[in-house]
């Protein structure tokens, strides 16, 4: 079973959020430490937030690969996307506009891949 991890992109602040968890109803909350009252839990408006799923894979440097990451394998660059229809991750070749499905990712030397950015910070 893959680990259930995610990261949150805040579209308004144009940054990834830390210390966020998702409630059982899908509501986003943020932990704030070192407040006057200790630890605080704050509701986050999810309208301008994007939840990016963890693929369960790591690049050659041990970094976790998430939806939205841009990876390089040999001399080709790919964008990782979530395919909701098949509940899997796809890999789109940015230079050739070819799309590969989940099983292809597992067989495509992903262990030799390197994360070179993401679609939010490296447009």
Where are these regions (language model features)?
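Secondary-structure transition motif
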Residues: 1-123
